[in-house]
Amino acid sequence: MFVDHVKIYVKGGDGGDGMVAFRREKYVPNGGPAGGDGGHGGNVVFEVEEGLRTLMDFRYKRHFKAPRGEHGMSKGMHGKNAEDLIVKVPPGTVVMNEETNAVIADLVEHGQRAVIAKAGRGGRGNSRFATPANPAPELSEKGEPGQELNVILELKVLADVGLVGFPSVGKSTLLSVVSAAKPKIGAYHFTTIVPNLGMIETDDHRSFAMADLPGLIEGAHEGVGLGHQFLRHIERTRVIVHVIDMSGMEGRDPYEDYLTINEELKQYNLRLTERPQIIVANKMDMPDAEENLTAFRQKVGEDVQIFPISAVSRQGLKELLFAIADLLEVTPEFPLYDEVEEQSDATVMYKHEAKGEDFEITRDDDGTFIISGYAIERLFKMTDFSREDGIRRFARQLRAMGVDEALRERGAQDGDTVRLQEFEFEFVD
């Protein structure tokens, strides 16, 4: 498929920190813990907006970070949860994890949403840790960091205008001079082997997406040449621009080319013939082109509008682009009935990858034991090491998870260095 492609960074909002606080009211001596919880961060959510056509906006903004939750407050007041960050994407956007190439979401329908980066939960305040043995704990949690990752967005482009015609009639040249697209251009058939997309803006500031599709040949509806894939792509377009080589230099008759291409469109799917079609007579700067155009007009009829142009010399391009923009304004979207069968019964909305083991122990070249893993790193990030109670709780949780025992099994002895992210401590058996 013909895709737009961009890499971006997304990060869910961090949770707010829990607070250590105590009641200090008049006539209430020795007040208990009163620290509130932090609020949850915001998710990064992608939402399909049917009015969008390309990923061009992501070329200029590549970082999306949801807001963090509010910190907990005294008097048991919890921090406010953050709002989700909603990012609009065009229909047909596929979101993939850059590191694993796993598909996170396939977004196809207007209004469809998918959580791309999960928010962190808020840390608990000290009122959550009160026990009969420790009724006034100086202990709270930091907010959980939000999920962060680099993702790749690929768009199955829904072009407004599709350029069709035999190979080497000048479709790629036309696209290259009316847009910033840089398709491969060569004096041989099938130079274009993948579709190219160009964004066009007319002098009166109307814009549309134009696709240069690989050349069609007789039998394309049966898969001959570059076949079904690109005929299917024409089906996504609203207007077809039929480019014909009027120079006759390929040894073909322009009128026969015109009939052959239209027959292929008809044979592939009758609905393709419902698309408005603009006929473009290209290479009018070549010898014999005027004579061939006169003969062509006589065969198709004087009531059929033809736009004579030269993509190389840019003759007639302004009038052509205005005509295309005018036609798009009055042409509705065409439903893609055939694609319903290709989609799965349940559209992919959201998929998290497995979080893996709680912890893993490896050994560095210098003999240091390295602890890693989703659960233990999450615990580390949410621990407030500036407070003695926080350090003690962290040590208790390591023992409860079996980290001490696992270190002994790996040969750890008194005084050995153990590292967890940027934190180093000595192992005590």
Swiss-Prot record:
Gene: obg
Keywords: Cytoplasm, GTP-binding, Hydrolase, Magnesium, Metal-binding, Nucleotide-binding
Residue ranges crossing the lipid bilayer per the database entry: none
A single GO BP: ribosome biogenesis
Record's function text: An essential GTPase which binds GTP, GDP and possibly (p)ppGpp with moderate affinity, with high nucleotide exchange rates and a fairly low GTP hydrolysis rate. Plays a role in control of the cell cycle, stress response, ribosome biogenesis and in those bacteria that undergo differentiation, in morphogenesis control.
Binding site for GTP: 165-172, 190-194, 212-215, 282-285, 310-312
Principal cellular location given in the protein's record: cytoplasm
Region described as Disordered: spans on this chain: 119-143
Name recorded for this polypeptide: GTPase Obg
Quaternary structure and partners: Monomer.
Origin organism lineage: Bacteria, Bacillati, Bacillota, Bacilli, Bacillales
Limits of the OBG-type G domain: 159-329
Gene3D superfamilies named among the record's database cross-references: GTP-binding protein OBG, C-terminal domain (3.30.300.350), GTP1/OBG domain (2.70.210.12), P-loop containing nucleotide triphosphate hydrolases (3.40.50.300)
